[in-house]
């Protein structure tokens, strides 16, 4: 039991005294956050621009909805309901 305690104490002391500690100083954390974005090019479409990605997603959804709407209204098999000359689309 005493050997286990000494071993755990030695490991804890080693972890806190060496640079193996996972806790970063504020300066190191800011430097890491600053440098992380520079290792890949900042071109449109990259996840660095989440708003642009979201807008592309919304445009794709809108395009798909428009295609489905036109597919429904131009379907020749539902004539009286889908004929734009007879019925105004709601």
Swiss-Prot record:
- Does the UniProt entry include the keyword Signal? yes
Q: Chief location of this protein? A: secreted
Q: Where in the cell is it found?
A: Secreted
| Alphabetically ordered keywords of this record | Secreted, Signal
Q: Which InterPro entries match?
A: DUF4543
Q: Which domain of life is it from?
A: Eukaryota
Gene Ontology cellular-component annotations: extracellular region
Query: Where in the sequence is the signal peptide annotated?
Result: 1-20
Q: Does the keyword Transferase apply?
A: no
Q: How is this protein named in the record?
A: Uncharacterized protein C17orf67 homolog
Q: Which organism is it from?
A: Mus musculus
């Amino acid at each position: 039991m005493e050997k286990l305690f000494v071993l755990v104490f030695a490991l804890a002391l080693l972890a806190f005294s060496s640079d193996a500690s996972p806790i970063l100083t504020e300066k190191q954390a800011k430097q890491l956050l600053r440098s992380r974005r520079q290792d890949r090019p900042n071109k449109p479409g990259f996840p660095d621009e989440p708003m642009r990605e979201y807008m592309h997603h919304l445009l794709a959804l809108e395009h798909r909805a428009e295609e489905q709407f036109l597919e429904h209204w131009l379907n020749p098999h539902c004539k009286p309901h889908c004929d734009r000359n007879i019925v105004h689309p709601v």
